[in-house]
Amino acid sequence: MIPVSLLVCVMAGWCAIYLADTLLRSSITHRIGYETWLASRGLMLSPFHVRWQTTMFNRLFSYCARINPRALYLIGGQQALQVVVPGVNLPTSQLAYFFIALLLSGVIHELGHAVAALREQVRVNGFGMFVFVMYPGAFVDLFTTHLNLISPAQQLRIFCAGVWHNFVLCVAALAFLFLLPIFLFPMYSTGVGALVTEVVQGSAADGPRGLSVGDIVTGLEDCPVRTVEDWSSCLFHLSHTAQTGYCVPVASLQPSWRLDGTMDCCSNNSLTDLCFSYIKPEHRKSREREYACMPVRKMVTGTRACRTDDDCAAGFHTASLCVTPSLENQTRFIRVTHLPNTHMLFVGYPPHLQYAVSLTNFVPRFGFLHLDLPVFLETFCKYVVSLSGALAVVNSVPCFALDGQWMLNALLEATLVTVVTDRQKRELIGFFLLLAGSALLAANVALGLWMVTAR
């Protein structure tokens, strides 16, 4: 969940702002100067809410309104929605990405409304941004009298412009994400392996013989790894197939037995040895397996991976058998090939290995380049795609207090005037449609919260 220290800092910050605002407003000597300073800068303060409004961008909006106006008449697309809960399905380490991408999506959304309004000869009083507790947002102040005088079709263009601009931003971020390898080609190479950018401390991949930041993973057993997607698919494949075996000369296999005749295959606390099982040629019909305890690193280094004894028949001068680690059903022994060090040997559940490291497809061509730059660009683009697309979808829903409410009202006025001549009946139809849309959206949000928090 969200760290308590973060909540304390946020609450303390808002309390300090509110206390300072209250003291300055109650001061006889500083009240007039303070309120004049706030008004001159377009600032408004209230509990857990800061709002800033300005007219300095009106010229920019006017200029944008004259660029390719036909694009404002197109309609947007769709995106899938998922409830985001910080600390549950949103890592607290990525909150900065979330809020910056959310603010950018909100600014572009309001920019669309402002540009479309100027195209329809509606005056823009100003543009502003706000912070409500921790939620950043933006708004545009339109001249209501002008807005009410234009036709419903013109109003609909203005109300749909925010959704359209969010869709355009979503597509642009998605295109940048796909073209990122081309943009970074002079500085970063791809397709040579998955580069380790972070190792979770205390995880199975941590330690002197584990993975380190800067290592390049090139294979998991006999599954080659060229990208992060290969890493995930190889782990999935290894976890859903039989344990990989290794070709070992028959002469080096010595079955383990106790003095009393019972089998003893490695002690439970052994850190260097592992129990392997195999089938001798004379026991193939009965499928009787024998077990041998062997030093695992020495045994698997330089050996060929196999599935059956037939895989070991070719290419070996001495008779060899395919031996497999004797483990529980879901536990796997995985040999991780990475540069520039030796193999990392992993014993456990494959998902634990996947979550133990952070990887990227981009390998720096020069030593002075930062490993996290491509990761930052990738992560930020993904958040922009998700949040901008989500804003487009949510504001398209006919729901109270969202753009969908005004879009629906304008659409009904533009299409039902000749069919339903009574304005009150049209408003009643719109009310029930808004009620249904709001109920569906609220139900989806509630269901999403339940699914996220119930995991």
Language-model-detected regions and their locations in the chain:
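Hydrophobic transmembrane alpha-helices and their immediate loop junctions
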Residues: 1-455
